[in-house]
Every structure is written in structure tokens, then in C-alpha cells.
Amino acid sequence: MVVTLDGEILQPGMPLLHADDLAAVRGDGVFETLLVRDGRACLVEAHLQRLTQSARLMDLPEPDLPRWRRAVEVATQRWVASTADEGALRLIYSRGREGGSAPTAYVMVSPVPARVIGARRDGVSAITLDRGLPADGGDAMPWLIASAKTLSYAVNMAVLRHAARQGAGDVIFVSTDGYVLEGPRSTVVIATDGDQGGGNPCLLTPPPWYPILRGTTQQALFEVARAKGYDCDYRALRVADLFDSQGIWLVSSMTLAARVHTLDGRRLPRTPIAEVFAELVDAAIVSDR
């Protein structure tokens, strides 16, 4: 199902994009993906803020947020009326037609992929791969727009296919100078011993000034976890820190929390906080309600 910013509902099979839309021919646009759970879209404002930031980095017109909110509401209501299942709600915003036009903007909802359900339940195996950027690449090379969520996902998809050929289900990118960055569709979060020893572990993720996308789910997770007494921080991490941690998760708005059970072919010990971590993420995803 597709909803335009005018509130028009398009059924599957109805034409939407022109053949020369820059979303299709260049990947020239931005997007967001939200989870629909328990009758509502999750973390809507956080995703709209990131959509706005991505549009700004891409020199796209400022998104009309009231119209986006209304389209999200209409799409969510229609989805919830038709099924009790979770939904994957996407916000698509492209530069428009190649010959010049207003931007293309719409919301679409589809079923949550089976892959996502499996990753939540069983975790994933992952491999580390060089991203080809230093940890300071975002500042040194701003034209790479590493902190924008763009439609240009060819590299992300290619790296996941490469991982599959190696027998892995996901990837953790590492900078050329050896620092952990992110997954191709997720934020890396690890649990370590707290600074005081004993008690709750500390949750860590790479610094947001790295050439990575800031995670909406990770930020909500840190807010919820801090309120429950967990230390949460942004820290430079090496691959060795992943192996030394109490647990590694790939966190995202759709998969939520995929525990990494195998890294670079090495089976990791079962983390004692696996269930608690999943509960924290479940609470975080609805923390704006």
C-alpha cells in the first residue's frame, strides 16, 4: 500500500514513479523505515528529524513535516485495519524527475520480512569488512554524505551478498584505521563491564561523528537504558573490543536487536543479558507513546 503526501491511497499495481524519476535512475533521494507495532508507527518524530537532516545533507527541499505526519497516520491506520501483523513503513523522498520537477514523496507499508523475524529470534553471524574510510572520513570528506540515509544502497546490498557467500548473515564495517563503524543497515551496540564493576553492564556504540548514520533505535535505547540505571556511552571501539564484550547487537528500527552469535567465524559465548537487552529495545521502540 502507498500513500502520497496528498493523502491519496494507491493500491499495489497502480503506477507511481515516472521512468526518469531520480530515485530510480540515480538513487538520488533519502528514506526512512519505521516499524508499525501494536497499532502505531514507532518513533515517528525521531525518523522525521533524521529524514529532515538527510534531506538537508542532500540539498533537497525541506520536508513538509505536517504532510508527512498525516501520510504516516493514514498509512498506519489502513495497515492496522487490514491486519494485526507488524508492518514495515517506509518514507521515500527523491529529487523528482530528471528533467526537473517537484520532489517525489510517498509512504509505503509492507509486511515485515521473514529475515527480520529470524534475526530477532536467532541472532546472526557477522563478518567484519573494511569500509574504505578512516574514522574521521565524515569530516574530511563531507561529500560522501555518510551520515545521510540515502536511497543509494547498492554498496550496502552488495556487501550483504558478499557476506552471504562467506556463510554470514550480516556485516560490521570497520574503518581503514581499525575502528568499528556500523552495519550496512544497523547500529553496533556492545555490552561491557560497568566502570564500577558489578551491577548493570555498560552499553557502548561508536561515536556519532564517525562516518556513520545516527541510529534512531540506538538513541531511544540509550534513553530507556539510562532511566533504568545502565551506563551508556559513545566510544571508539576496535574489533578486539567486540570479542572482549559481554555481547554484540546490530540494532535497527525493523530488526530491533539482532544478537551477533558468531563473528568472523568465531562462535561467541551466550551473553547473560540477551533477554534483558531485547526487553530494553522493545521498550525503547515505543518510548514515544
Curated annotation (Swiss-Prot):
Site (Important for dual ACDL/DAAT activities): R26
Pfam families membership: Aminotran_4
An example molecular function term from Gene Ontology annotations: pyridoxal phosphate binding
Keywords per UniProt: Aminotransferase, Cell shape, Folate biosynthesis, Lyase, Peptidoglycan synthesis, Pyridoxal phosphate, Transferase
SUPFAM superfamilies registered for this protein in UniProt: D-aminoacid aminotransferase-like PLP-dependent enzymes (SSF56752)
Knocked-out gene: effects: Deletion mutant exhibits a growth defect in liquid culture. Mutant is significantly impaired for folate biosynthesis and exhibits minor defects in D-amino acid metabolism. It shows a marked and selective accumulation of ADC, while the levels of PABA and downstream intermediates of folate biosynthesis are markedly depleted. It also exhibits a selective and genetically complementable defect in D-glutamate pools, but not D-alanine pools.
EC annotation from Swiss-Prot or TrEMBL: 2.6.1.21, 4.1.3.38
UniProt binding sites for pyridoxal 5'-phosphate: R50, Y153, T216, T217, S253
Catalytic activity: 4-amino-4-deoxychorismate = 4-aminobenzoate + pyruvate + H(+); D-alanine + 2-oxoglutarate = D-glutamate + pyruvate
Cofactor field: pyridoxal 5'-phosphate
UniProt KW Translocase keyword: no
Pathway annotation from the record: Cofactor biosynthesis; tetrahydrofolate biosynthesis; 4-aminobenzoate from chorismate: step 2/2; Cell wall biogenesis; peptidoglycan biosynthesis
Record's keyword annotation contains Lyase: yes
Binding-site residues for 2-oxoglutarate, renumbered to this chain: S252, M254, T255
Effect on the protein of changing R26A: Decreases kcat of both reactions
PTM annotation (N6-(pyridoxal phosphate)lysine): residues: K149
Biological process (GO), any one: carboxylic acid metabolic process
InterPro entries: Aminodeoxychorismate_lyase_IV (IPR017824), Aminotrans_IV (IPR001544), Aminotransferase-like (IPR036038), BCAT-like_C (IPR043132), BCAT-like_N (IPR043131), Class-IV_PLP-Dep_Aminotrnsfr (IPR050571)
GO cellular component annotations of the record: cytosol; plasma membrane
Family in the record: Belongs to the class-IV pyridoxal-phosphate-dependent aminotransferase family.
Role description: Bifunctional enzyme that catalyzes two enzymatic reactions in biochemically unrelated pathways: acts as an aminodeoxychorismate (ADC) lyase (ADCL) in folate biosynthesis, converting 4-amino-4-deoxychorismate (ADC) to 4-aminobenzoate (PABA), and as a D-amino acid transaminase (DAAT) in peptidoglycan (PG) biosynthesis. DAAT activity is strictly restricted to D-alanine and D-glutamate. May function as a metabolic toggle that alternates between ADCL and DAAT activity, prioritizing the former over the latter in response to substrate accumulation.
Database matches in NCBIfam families: PRK07849.1-1, PRK07849.1-2
Subunit and partners: Homodimer.
Name of this protein: Bifunctional aminodeoxychorismate lyase / D-amino acid transaminase
